[in-house]
A protein has these predicted regions:
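Basic, glycine-/proline-tolerant helical and adjacent loop/strand elements
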Residues: 2-173, 178-182
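Long, contiguous all-alpha helical interaction modules
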Residues: 1-5, 11-12, 174-462
């Protein structure tokens, strides 16, 4: 029953203060918003909590009518001498007449699942707890069922207190009109700390002072989330993080290649970063990285393309070391190729052929960049790299280079020995048929974006 005395006391206070409440508390009555007023049950210095039962009673008046989805989805189950109430909880599933597909019509009770009042209340408290985390930007929830703890992090958090979860759950939540659980998955042996340190390297020897924005992240990265930040910023120009769960039609990215890549690969990237699922990530990275590098270059973002190749080759070294495959690292390969081609280009002796296919395709990238540099066009579009990057037949590739030579030879000095050496070694070398397309494209891009050996000043011996 309602305590009439307390009810009238509250009613009287409302009538007396409602139109001057802004004088009691800081509030803007001009706003079109709801105003909630709460009355304390306990007195200021009350020690024996006389009204404790009243507090619980009023709390229950509000909670229990709202704990279930609808009254029509509540049933009473008789157990011996008493009845238990079960219903479809308000949180977790929203069932109404517009969603008849949620009904399970093959059984007597069509309601998808039922909870008793205690469990429904517990679920309500859990969802409210999750909502408070979502409101504060803590979107990544890790539930450790072995150590009985919950950890919540934003995408930017360093996670210094987070080590591993041997068994548990992962939730990705978002605040919408209600709490949205965007992803739920079981987690087994998840570690944010990488098994091996990830070394983000600079293969182009970029000048740190001239390009601080592009070199600031060079170095060791210990955690998946740290590497995930590199993926988001370098590969996806910061568009991935905000579009993991956006409907494809709602992704506001004008670049069609970037948008398509986000839609195709965001799930496997998300799983690797936040769930520790390694399956397919290496293969996916190998595919999308090359597409994004080419796309950046075609759109005249050369520095971005260089950092993307840096990150891709850093991943290549990481996975090679992780699988203990051995062999040379990409930094060694890049340096050897650069120095070998430079030595051949600057030589005044007889022309020497490239040692292997990697050197050959690097040289192709170098000569393509040189031809484009000779263009008299006011705006030199990097899309000209398409003339050589998308050719699979070597004979056609050489014919295309000869066409470029005929187009720009008016600007080439007859005594340009470096050009002659570079062009001669390309025309005189026949690559192996088994060279894979990925390696070919990577080396052409590397040669194209690297400092050009025709223009590089010759080092003089002391």
């Amino acid at each position: 029953p309602v305590n009439i005395e307390i009810l009238e006391k509250c009613r009287s206070w409302i009538k007396q203060h409602i139109f001057s409440i802004d004088k009691l508390v800081q509030i803007d009555l001009g706003k079109k918003d709801y105003l909630k007023i709460f009355f304390e049950v306990f007195e200021v210095n009350e020690e024996d909590n006389k009204n404790r039962e009243l507090f619980i009673q009023e709390d229950n008046r509000y909670i229990y009518p709202n704990i279930y989805n609808k009254s029509e989805y509540i049933i009473n189950v008789k157990k011996k001498v008493y009845e238990d109430t079960y219903g479809l909880p308000y949180y977790g599933i929203n069932m109404n007449r517009k969603k008849p597909f949620l009904k399970i019509k093959t059984r007597k009770t069509f309601i998808p699942y039922l909870l008793d009042m205690d469990k429904a209340l517990l679920q309500k408290q859990f969802f409210e707890y999750l909502m408070s985390l979502a409101v504060n930007g803590k979107n990544n929830i890790y539930i450790d069922i072995k150590n009985y703890r919950i950890r919540a992090y934003s995408d930017q958090d360093e996670r210094k207190d987070f080590s591993e979860i041997s068994s548990g759950y992962y939730l990705r939540i978002q605040k919408g009109k209600e709490l949205e659980i965007q992803v739920q998955d079981n987690i087994v042996d998840y570690q944010n700390k990488l098994l091996l340190n990830f070394y983000y390297q600079d293969f182009f020897k970029m000048n740190v002072e001239n390009y601080p924005e592009y070199t600031k992240d060079i170095g060791i990265h210990l955690k998946r989330t740290s590497v995930g930040r590199l993926i988001n910023e370098i590969f996806f120009s910061k568009y991935l993080l905000t579009n993991y769960f956006t409907d494809a039609s709602d992704i506001s990215v004008k670049d069609s290649v970037l948008k398509r890549t986000i839609v195709m690969y965001r799930n496997v990237i998300f799983d690797w970063i936040y769930k520790g699922i390694d399956n397919n990530f290496e293969l996916a990275e190998r595919r999308f990285s090359l597409d994004l590098i080419k796309n950046a270059l075609i759109n005249n973002y050369t520095l971005r393309a260089m950092t993307q190749l840096n990150l891709h080759w850093s991943f290549k070294d990481y996975f090679t070391e992780l699988k203990q495959q051995g062999g040379e690292k990409m930094a060694e390969i890049a340096t050897e190729i650069r120095e070998s081609i430079k030595e051949r280009v600057t030589s005044k002796e007889e022309v020497k052929m490239p040692i292997n296919d990697k050197e050959y395709y690097y040289a192709v990238g170098q000569i393509a960049a040189y031809f484009i540099s000779l263009s008299k066009a006011g705006k030199k579009s990097q899309s000209m790299i398409n003339l050589v990057i998308n050719i699979s037949d070597d004979r056609v590739l050489k014919e295309r280079l000869i066409q470029l030579y005929k187009k720009y030879n008016y600007a080439i000095d007859h005594y340009n020995v470096r050009f002659k050496n570079l062009f001669a070694m390309i025309l005189g070398y026949k690559p192996a048929a088994q060279t894979d397309r990925q390696t070919k494209d990577e080396m052409i891009l590397f040669g194209y974006m690297d400092s050009n050996s025709i223009y590089t000043k010759k080092e003089e011996n002391n």
